[in-house]
Design a protein with these regions (language model features):
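Intrinsically disordered, low-complexity repeat regions enriched in Pro/Gln/Gly/Tyr
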Residues: 1-2, 120-172
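Active-site substrate-binding loop specific to GH73 endo-beta-N-acetylglucosaminidase modules
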Residues: 117
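Peripheral membrane lipid-binding modules
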Residues: 3, 10-113, 124, 145, ...
Length: 172
């Protein structure tokens, strides 16, 4: 199917309005569930309401329509505190290939903040999948031309201005 392949999931950061800590700072992490896989970011240590994760996970998906995301405050002593959750719709990702969005986290019917997630979809290979094929070929051709097609232009176009710089660089 056109909707089977790899879903690259990048929970980037969050802006939270709910604070679970009376003392000290929150160490929040995100838990993402899709296609039978569960991923957890590292707790953003002492980053409070502005956790910055910048992590990347890869899930195999097959037409999955929703990814569930929940944010918790990691607690060493008691159970982790629940901050909020959202459902990330995946319908768009199969055609658009990559999206970058803020999603509202809900807790007990109220917004508890927002989470930024970048998604990329890489379709499984196969003749039926022209999009995937096209991307593959498109990637290869510039690589091939790099040696032949690009070099003369770099040589002719750039050579004269860079000659002086080149020598200047080499001498010291």
């Amino acid at each position: 199917s056109m909707q089977s392949g790899q879903l690259v999931i990048k929970p980037v950061s969050a802006q939270l309005t709910y604070d679970s800590e009376w003392f000290g700072s929150m160490d929040c992490y995100a838990k993402l569930t899709v296609g039978g896989s569960v991923f957890k970011t590292r707790p953003a240590h002492d980053q409070g309401k502005h956790p910055n994760w910048q992590e990347t996970f890869t899930a195999m998906v097959n037409g999955d329509q929703v990814m569930h995301v929940a944010v918790y405050d990691h607690d060493n002593v008691t159970a982790d505190d629940y901050i909020g959750e959202c459902q990330v719709p995946l319908q768009d990702i199969y055609s658009r290939r990559n999206t970058s969005n803020w999603y509202t986290l809900m807790r007990k019917g109220k917004s508890s903040g927002q989470i930024m997630i970048i998604l990329e979809f890489v379709p499984s290979g196969g003749m039926g999948n022209m999009g995937g094929m096209g991307m593959g070929m498109g990637m290869q051709t510039p690589g091939m031309n790099m040696g032949m097609g690009m070099q003369p232009q770099m040589g002719y176009g750039m050579q004269q201005p860079q000659m002086g710089m080149g020598y200047g660089m080499q001498q010291p």
